[in-house]
A protein has these predicted regions:
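N-terminal active-site beta-alpha-beta segment that forms phosphate/nucleotide-binding
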Residues: 1-106
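Redox-cofactor binding/interface segments in oxidoreductases and associated redox assembly factors
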Residues: 46, 115-116
Length: 134
């Protein structure tokens, strides 16, 4: 059932215009930036948006010199966290998603996580991609 739901909602998301996705990205990150948890966070782990996902690169670029930004790197089917200080540290990795070139993995505490999703229900429950990374 989840597999069919994933497929259905990815198809629907892919139908959204680029202008709408840009608007939604801006709105979502405005909400995050105004949240007290974000304001207090020193270490933020965020996925690097891909395809029709919410565009995270502008957010990363905005905050990379103001907070410690960590992004995922997949290695042997395991998601690892890597601290980046520049977008130049990213290169195309698994599934065509930008990943850090560094293999210096972080295993400490993170203050805030921005998680990818295919869809959320009205109660805030998330349907992800089913890889078990998040």
């Amino acid at each position: 059932m989840k597999k069919e739901l994933r497929k259905k909602f990815i198809i629907e998301r892919n139908k959204l215009s680029e202008a709408y996705r840009d608007y939604a990205s801006t709105k979502i990150f405005s909400i995050i930036e105004n949240n007290e948890l974000f304001k207090l966070a020193g270490k933020v782990f965020i996925y690097v948006g891909f395809g029709s996902e919410i565009a995270t690169i502008p957010f990363i670029k905005k905050w990379i010199n103001k907070k410690q930004i960590f992004v995922p790197k997949i290695d042997n089917n395991t998601m690892n966290l890597v601290h980046i200080t520049s977008l130049k540290e990213l290169t195309e990795g698994h599934f065509g998603v930008l990943e850090p070139t560094s293999c210096e993995y972080f295993n400490g505490n993170i203050d805030l996580v921005v998680t990818p999703s295919i869809v959320f229900d009205k109660n805030g429950y998330r349907l992800g991609y089913g890889k078990g990374y998040y």
